[in-house]
Amino acid sequence: MNKDLQIAKKTVQTEIQALTKLSKSFGRSSYFSTAVNLLSKIKGKCLVVGVGKSYLVGLKVSATLSSLGTPSVAFSANDLQHGGLGAIQKNHDILLVFSVSGESLELNSILKYANEHKISVIGVSCKSSSMLLRYSTIKILLPKVIEAGHSLAPTSSSLIFLSWGDSLAIACMRKQKWDNKKFILTHPSGTLATALIQVKEIM
C-alpha cells in the first residue's frame, strides 16, 4: 500500500474511533433527551451558531433540522454580532451553539445577549469548563477526540458534531411524528420526494 493510501486509511480509522467515542457518550448523560424535548416544543425556530468550521457544520445541521420538521436557520457568530441578533424572536427561538473549545471570543456577546433576554441556549462543546457551557441552558459535553492529520485542522471533531446534529434532528423528527406526507410537502422536488409520491400513488 502506497503512502497516500496509508494516510487515507489512517484518517478514516481515526474518525471511526471518534464516532465510537461519541456513540458511547450518549449513555452517560440525559441532556441529549432534554435538548430533544425542548426543540420538539419549539414555537419559533432554532438558530444554529458557530465560528469557522463549526459554523460550516452548523449549516448542515440546520438544513437537516428544517428538512425533518424543526424550523432552523444558521448564522455565523460574526454575522450575529453585526445585526443578526435582530433575527431572534424572544420567547420563541432557541440557540444551538457549536464550538469545540467553547471559548471563541465571537460567542461572548451573543451568549450574554441570550442570557439577558432569557433565550434558551443549547451549547455543544468538548470542554466542560468552557464559557459556552457556563452560559448554556442545556450543556452538551461531547468527548475529546484525536483530530486526523496531526491536529492541524478540525476533522474528527467536526465529524462528531455533525453526527450529533444528525442524531438530534432525527430524534426530534420521531418525537414530532414527522411522516412521509409532511416530508413530501417540504420536498416538492428531488428523487426522495418523487419516490415517496410514486409509492403513495401505488398504495
Spans of features found by a protein language model:
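Internal, active-site/partner-interface "lid" segment
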Residues: 134, 148, 174-203
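Generic recognition of short, well-ordered alpha-helical interface segments
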Residues: 10, 14, 159, 163, ...
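An N-terminal, well-structured beta->alpha segment
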Residues: 1-41
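Short, basic/glycine-rich phosphate-binding loops at helix/coil junctions
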Residues: 9-18, 65, 197-203
